[in-house]
């Protein structure tokens, strides 16, 4: 963002923190690859359960993948939140899109980079993969990403309805 060029001191501080954290992560990487114990440099947020399986800590390769992903996401978000001169609305909008993109690119979302999904596929003899592909094909055919099964909600049984009026409407929601 061009705002950083207008604030060279803040940019310098940001880059120094990045360089220091990068050096610490590189030392951690060398230690892990050498088979030595090394505490994680970047910890997931307490409510982030994506890396809660012990394999993400106990196996060096998976641990490093987790560490590099968390390092990258943490620094991208820090840079965004510290960007000088951004209007609050612009900052929130950018944070929303960056957070969604970073979450979408998490190693936990891809079979090749998710040891938990790989283990599940082996345990289930591929049934989890087959079911996932079926859901994907259903979503492609429906031209939407469904979060529930189409028949999950029935008016009067699992879905309540009452007469009402819209009391609040904005870009994200309607409150009735």
Residues covered by each model-derived region:
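Amphipathic, low-complexity, repeat-rich surface-exposed segments
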Residues: 1-173
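Conserved beta-strand in the GNAT
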Residues: 176
């Amino acid at each position: 963002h061009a705002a950083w060029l207008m604030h060279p001191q803040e940019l310098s501080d940001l880059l120094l923190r990045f360089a220091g954290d990068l050096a610490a992560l590189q030392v951690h990487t060398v230690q892990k690859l050498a088979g030595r114990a090394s505490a994680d440099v970047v910890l997931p947020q307490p409510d982030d359960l994506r890396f809660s399986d012990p394999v993400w800590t106990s196996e060096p390769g998976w641990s490093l993948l987790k560490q590099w992903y968390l390092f990258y996401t943490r620094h991208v978000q820090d840079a965004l939140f510290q960007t000088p001169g951004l209007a609050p609305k612009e900052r929130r909008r950018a944070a929303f899109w960056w957070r969604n993109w970073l979450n979408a690119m998490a190693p936990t979302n891809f079979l090749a980079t998710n040891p938990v999904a790989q283990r599940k596929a082996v345990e289930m003899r591929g049934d989890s993969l087959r079911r996932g592909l079926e859901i994907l094909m259903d979503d492609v055919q429906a031209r939407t990403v469904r979060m529930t099964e189409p028949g999950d909600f029935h008016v009067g049984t699992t879905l309540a309805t009452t007469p009402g009026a819209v009391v609040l409407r904005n870009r994200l929601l309607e409150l009735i």
